[in-house]
Amino acid sequence: MTLRIATVSLNSAVDQTVTVPGFTADAVNRVAASRIDAGGKGVNVASFLAHVGHGVAVTGLLGAENAALFARHFAATGLVDACQRLPGATRTNVKIVDPLQDQVTDLNFPGIAAGPADLDAVAATLTELLAQGLDWVALCGSLPAGIGAEAYAELAALARKGGARVALDTSGPALGLALAARPDIVKPNVAELGAHLGRTLTGLESVREAARDLAASGVGLVAVSMGAGGAVLVRGAEAVLAIPPATPIASTVGAGDAMVAGLIHAATLGLDLAETARLATAFSLGALGEIGPHLPPPERLAALARTVTVKTLPPV
């Protein structure tokens, strides 16, 4: 399979999903089920893209102590493993899923310590991958301690120089700095976008205006995820609202990452904005129906896409 996409995962994680019916804080709880998956945003986006037939490489940073879990996952999913190994263990993120109360509690651990030399190694690997003719580079997730907020801005510029389009899914200072590279896709959630713009976003109108402001800064496509409220997508003068149907949630692990993968997949298919919104939302719905960072079969994704309502929004 031809390698066309690379994801960068600087702060990968072991995703532990624990099912605890009736979870109660400050009490003894019994675990009904548990599973462990190789994860982190960049890993998840790569896995989802491979699931729908793309040739994908993952570069970034992993702790050597538990890298075998990731190596097995990469081999099983057909991903190219281009990750650097660092001393120590990749962090664990725990999601406590309570199906009775329809709640998910997140426990996110700090990432492995890294430094400028490690980022240089990732950049060198990305340069080698770009030389193979990448179409897309996805920069995903938070940054570990020791890596400066400018990391994604530098990698985005590198990807641009290498002829690739750039998708960005991060938050905080890393988001603000990377926007200078004018990525082709940016997918913040409502809270992340509001924090970046310095204002609270309440209601569809404020989200639409904020997405338009971000698009006006030079971003090709802005997709703002709003949880059960759907997503607002803005590209140029166009704006749409994707409304998902009410659906049972098995786990929220990877739902946002699935939307990023759906946006990239839609771009490779040349879909218009409405169909892009429909497909990306279907990817997110598919992940919500699975335990752990997984997608259902492609035919199920197609069926989910047909359940998504897309409304055209007036230009700002």
UniProtKB/Swiss-Prot annotation:
The keyword Kinase applies. InterPro entries: 1-PFruKinase, Carboh/pur_kinase_PfkB_CS, PfkB_dom, Ribokinase-like, Tagatose/fructose_Pkinase. Pfam families: PfkB. CDD domains: FruK_PfkB_like. It catalyses: beta-D-fructose 1-phosphate + ATP = beta-D-fructose 1,6-bisphosphate + ADP + H(+). GO terms for molecular function: 1-phosphofructokinase activity; ATP binding. Its EC number is 2.7.1.56. The active site is at 257 (proton acceptor). ATP binds at residues 225-230, 256-257. GO terms for cellular component: cytosol. Keywords: ATP-binding, Kinase, Nucleotide-binding, Transferase. The keyword Kinase applies. Belongs to the carbohydrate kinase PfkB family. Catalyzes the ATP-dependent phosphorylation of fructose-l-phosphate to fructose-l,6-bisphosphate. This is 1-phosphofructokinase. It comes from Rhodobacter capsulatus (Rhodopseudomonas capsulata). The gene is fruK.
